[in-house]
């Protein structure tokens, strides 16, 4: 039987608090460090590896973390989730994003249908539509092929799909699977939509409107912006727009769209990249086969997350170490540092994934918790970040755990040799150097040049960013966040924190304000 308990009530957590702290500088020095790098490593799916040698752990800490995983019933809770139990307690909903890429357990029926069948049917419909667009069977009003796809959405309807598109754009061009350029409109700031519309040929563009409810203010505002641009160009908007929405939304059967593809209430926006939300734009941009490879990579990583052995379950181990850093060592934030320009927007997606899921101060029963929960997530690609905020990471007063991601090979495979090394070798040399520099530091009599070290990090290493490895990387972090939510006894699948601002904004627009809200509204000339 599964029990849901706060982290600070677990016996194994109290034992973890009493385990002797690791001196990371000493642990990573010399041959000790070399042995840790060899031994503290867990295989992931699709050729990826999670290496935690530079984390502030040793065998004693790891043994305590394994006990915590057992007592917190992490794999049992994951099993309950993928077998269709109501895990989103706040909204009384199932949590089924894993089922968009595979079936990990029992068949799950909801709304009178088998959910795995529902998701695969939507994927098949999207694939058929995308293939017809690419073949010129579905065209604009003049019978001409579409060349650009524009996604209109916000939050999870934008951040994840945008990050995945950018991650695979150059790979697709190199591998001759690039079909259409993709653009994204998300912000209600009119300059966002105007800039995108000014950069494309609207006559040859197809727009994907993404709104589960069909009532999202920002998205519908931007849809009107786009429809106005199409009308001004003498075009029929209904020949240029498709919808990704729920079957019960007002968009589902509207004549305003070429086609509608469906999601449901069991997939949160930040977990929706492997659903129709990501499927439509990625299939149009790169072809359905590429999206299928992306799903396969995610499914393979999901399968690893079922393993009860924490040392064969990279997402669970990553989650446990993160909770140790947050709740025992007291570190307030985590930097995500991919050494790949392809992953330029991946930190922004992970920021939403993590902070919207676990940025909670009450447990799944609505009771206040007495311990820190989700960390602040931020990051930029390397080596750019080294010349930006790494100064604070190396010598600041806060210790910030680091999550590196690095690849042995570039996507474009175009490179030059300068000073006896390629650009890719320089990139990889920098990430290796940073891990050791953060961990070991460097003593100097000049205090301004002294590096204390003891800055923990992990790295996920792969051969190349491709559809399958990207899917595995995404699933790793989704499952890490899930496991941490289980440990903190949170509901990681709602986001009430976004609601209050929306309510107040509607009051401002209706001029129903007083006090500070009225004064701020007047200052902004609303």
PLM segments and residue spans:
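C-terminal structured subdomain/cap of oxidoreductase catalytic cores
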Residues: 449, 465-517
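Glycine-rich phosphate-binding loops that contact phosphosugars or nucleotide phosphates
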Residues: 128-136, 142-308, 507-510
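Active-site phosphate/pyrophosphate-binding segments
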Residues: 229-414, 453, 500-526
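Basic, glycine-rich polyanion-binding accessory segments appended to enzymes
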Residues: 410, 457-471
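Acidic, Ser/Thr-rich peripheral helices and adjacent loops at domain boundaries
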Residues: 413-449
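Short, solvent-exposed amphipathic alpha-helical segments in soluble enzyme
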Residues: 164-169, 198-202, 224-226, 350-358, ...
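Short glycine-rich or small-residue beta-strand-to-loop segments that form or flank ligand, phosphate
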Residues: 147-155, 207-213, 333-340, 377, ...
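Extended, charge-enriched "interface" segments that sit outside catalytic cores
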Residues: 4-142, 420-428, 439-440, 462, ...
